Amino acid sequence: MFMRLYMVNGCQVRMCSYHYQDRFFMSRNRGKGTGKAACAAASFSQSFLPMTRAEMDARGWSELDILLISGDAYVDHPAFGVPLLGRLLEKRGWRVGIVAQPRWDSPEDISRMGRPRLFCGISAGSLDSMLCHYTAFRKKRHDDPYTPGGKSGARPNRACIVYSNLVRAAFPGMFVVLGGIEASLRRLAHYDFWSDSLRRSLLLDSKADLIIYGMGEYGISELARRLQSGEPTTGIAGTVRVSDQAEGALLLPSYEEILEDKRKLLEATRLMEAAMHEGTRPLAQAHGRKFVYCEPPAGQLGTEQLDAIYELPFTRLAHPSYREPIPALEMVKWSVTAVRGCGGGCSFCSIALHQSRHLCSRSPESLHQEVRKLTAMPGWKGMVSDVGGPTANLWGASCRLDGRNCQRESCLYPECCPQLQLRQGEYLELLRSLTRLPGVKRVGIGSGIRFDAALKDRRFLDGLVGEFVSGQLKLAPEHCSERVLHLMRKTDFRLFEEFTGQFASLCRKHGKEQYIIPYVMSAFPGCTIEDMQTLATWFRSRGWKPQQAQCFIPTPGTVATAMYYAECDSRGKPIYVAKTDREREDQHAVLYGGKRPGRPKTRSRT
């Protein structure tokens, strides 16, 4: 799927209440479905995890073990985090319910299925709620792809805090755990672009009991097991808690120290980034007299474990209560996830901080099985839109040292690590094997690829261009300035130009009219107006018009955001940072001839 987390900074995507009356069987009578419509809907939706008391009754459940709350609509698809964790918990024998996009003026939606026996899990959704609501220029967004009809306003600002307060009001004394991208990247003191301030750990502001950071399969399963057996919840890998002590932990600069010296945020962020990769020692950060104590990461799943998760009985559909389509589902409906993790380590990218740099790939057999399921679904037209992940052509890649004693910030920058074993030829054969399955007419790559890696295998590149580019290929050079690319930890721009030349040559060889869609960024820390003019000149020299240009958004937790906040590079050297909206808008406008960017009417052609 090409919904990369760093899509926020490479190509990314009215506070009002979304009432459940808009869903045809939701009742305002204490959250219980009533009448024939409710019964029919409950019967129809038994293949989904329950969202109402009527659906619980249809399963013969008197109570839930675990309640999961999400800022996204409920889509029973493995690309959506809360439903995936719900299916995993269900497989392990727990009774799980989901509340999707609850109203935040009352705890009624939260409480409609009753108090869960073990805990409530909360996620703001697939995006940080502030990023979901506001553009790079702090303007309100008018859409939300994770909501029926794509309508904005179905989740609150700072959703984890709001939902946690609702749970406390609905169920006093309930164990509350936060997860998902918002909680994961705000687990320690962080800069918040939307308030232009340093904020404390989300764990303190939300008053939750625990944060599960990163991919949460291990953490949430172990938490359920321990609460069931009455064991302490301390020491679970991949979790964050509040502690009176920091025993055995690596101490980060405190919240108060960062307030005094902004450069301390860079120090803390780089230590957190290294710990996410090395995964051997806990971290602790003082906030006043308390410590936010971060256990080592849970680690990447193995192939068999990953296969088992994606083979859970997902319907791959939105919950039947929704009357309108959910745009995010349409984007991934006919795609399959083949790989997790990304070795790129770009300084602005959230993936390495959430999924880690360690790569894990699914087996060909598991992917074949999932594609066979796609071919049996209503609406199937023969096209697998994507077989990928954060970086499609890193499927099957692995580290010869398994990441042990690795001090690199990236597996691919400044050049490809000699310990990284690429298997792009095997990936190409995987794609070909999928096209031979009954009912499959075509397989495409909707994810982005690393062009620097692709250049290392001419046969892969030839097969990619000749067979698996669906008209457009997404690449992320991000900029052309060597200095800016160094700050981004991105590949030399000359490699991008080499790739475009080979791509054009191979398109001619195969008689195909295909396009490269380059993703570029403005207003990155260290980027000047002159740098943007150079980039705009390059586009004009090729006869291209930028389609996917994103103004840098300082999302919590990344090295680039710390550079923005501190106005220095990762080594502490002062750099220019475009901070005012005017400066940022001016840089972005350079790509469009000094005008505000509109929807491009032409495509970049090779």
Predicted features, each with a name:
Residues 105, 234-260, 298, 362, ...:
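Terminal amphipathic helices with adjacent charged low-complexity linkers/tails
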Residues 68, 84, 103-104, 373-517, ...:
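Conserved SAM/AdoMet-binding glycine-rich loop
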Residues 460, 525-540:
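Catalytic cores of alpha/beta
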